[in-house]
A protein has these predicted regions:
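Acidic, surface-exposed loops and disordered segments
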Residues: 1-150
Length: 150
């Protein structure tokens, strides 16, 4: 199946079957895929948390925007979190990225206001979400993008 066909078949799941579970092998594959997600300058300013424990899912569902039923029914919840500590992020890129990427950040992003840098970091997380949703579609795993868990 080519990517266009995959995109045409992808859908947002409205209701999950609570008896269907994603396998550990599929979870490990998804984790590897997320590690390979694209981001500007390969910054990867994110954390991904896979939640299968029903009690934890219920706690997160209770503070989500209108998605409580979906979260509680789904096999797993994957929380995409942005690194919001700019100093930590800058230390991370200094240690892990090539000099060209570091120079780009220092020249174009670092001089920006803190709110602009945080917005840029958040946009990187959305790139990984799109990548993840495409991976789920390719693996025939139902998915629903959601916002609202702080």
């Amino acid at each position: 199946m080519n990517f266009l066909e995959l995109a045409q078949q992808r859908y947002t799941t409205k209701k999950y079957n609570p008896t269907q579970k994603i396998t550990n092998e599929e979870i490990e594959t998804l984790k590897q895929i997320l590690q390979l997600s694209p981001s500007s300058i390969n910054s990867q300013p994110w954390h991904f948390t896979f939640v299968a424990d029903q009690e934890q899912k219920s706690k997160l569902a209770a503070v989500s925007y209108f998605n409580e039923e979906r979260i509680n029914q789904a096999s797993h919840l994957v929380v995409f979190s942005v690194i919001d500590d700019i100093a930590l992020f800058e230390k991370q890129i200094e240690q892990n990225l090539p000099q060209g990427a570091i120079n780009y950040y220092k020249q174009f992003m670092q001089p920006q206001a803190e709110e602009n840098i945080k917005s840029w970091l958040q946009h990187q997380v959305y790139l990984s979400l799109g990548f993840f949703l495409s991976a789920c579609a390719a693996m025939h795993i139902d998915s629903t993008p959601m916002e609202g868990i702080e």
